[in-house]
Amino acid sequence: MTRNSQSLEVSLSLLDEFLSTLSTPFLSGSDLSHLDCEVLPKLHHLRVAASILRGYHIPATYTSLWRYLHHGYNHPVFRRSCPPDQEIVLHWAGRPDTPTISTENHNMLTREIPKFSFDIPAVAVPAKIEN
């Protein structure tokens, strides 16, 4: 997780701008590619872990980024392979370069029913699929 939120904002803004140029739901076309399988989990981890550990939320104004996540969240492969939010937070909280969580919060996360943040806070207009 980056320590510099301004750098993160610039990177997310550039990604949103790039995604706005696509006419397909995924980076290489109408279905998931290897590239999407690299990018989507990283964005999802950022969304979940940064929210809990740093209080950072991806701005709703990044509508193309949210649309991209929306397509990922609705793809069966992504949904089946995505870890629960609690596992993502515990993974990142255990790293030396991220904020730690209290023992009480750690124990609570391990006992909770698994949650999956697949909701979209912005309007995610589906991309037009070209044949």
Residue ranges and their predicted role:
Residues M1-P83, I129-E130:
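GST-like fold's C-terminal all-alpha helical module
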